[in-house]
Swiss-Prot record:
One of its GO terms (molecular function) is structural constituent of ribosome. Gene3D superfamilies: Ribosomal protein L30, ferredoxin-like fold domain. Part of the 50S ribosomal subunit. It comes from the Bacteria. The keyword Mitochondrion does not apply. It comes from Syntrophobacter fumaroxidans (strain DSM 10017 / MPOB). This is Large ribosomal subunit protein uL30. The keyword Ubl conjugation does not apply. InterPro entries: Ribo_uL30_ferredoxin-like_sf, Ribosomal_uL30_bac-type, Ribosomal_uL30_ferredoxin-like. One of its GO terms (biological process) is translation. Keywords: Ribonucleoprotein, Ribosomal protein.
Length: 60
């Protein structure tokens, strides 16, 4: 696994369960097309896995 990953929000959280919105907020994804660089830890990987249908992930 890469040391860091780039995550971009590409699908709107409107109409999604509250749990998914909280995960996105915890990852720092507050707006559409916002990109964040995160360390690739097991906790971050699990959070990204929960919202993988709403984000794009790139390994850095």
């Amino acid at each position: 696994m890469a040391k860091s990953i780039q995550v971009k929000l590409v699908r709107s959280p409107i109409g999604r369960p509250e749990k998914h919105r909280k995960v996105l907020q915890a990852l720092g994804l507050t707006r559409l097309n916002k990109t964040v660089n995160l360390h690739a830890t097991p906790a971050v990987a699990g959070a990204v896995k929960k919202v993988i249908h709403m984000v794009e992930v790139k390994e850095l």
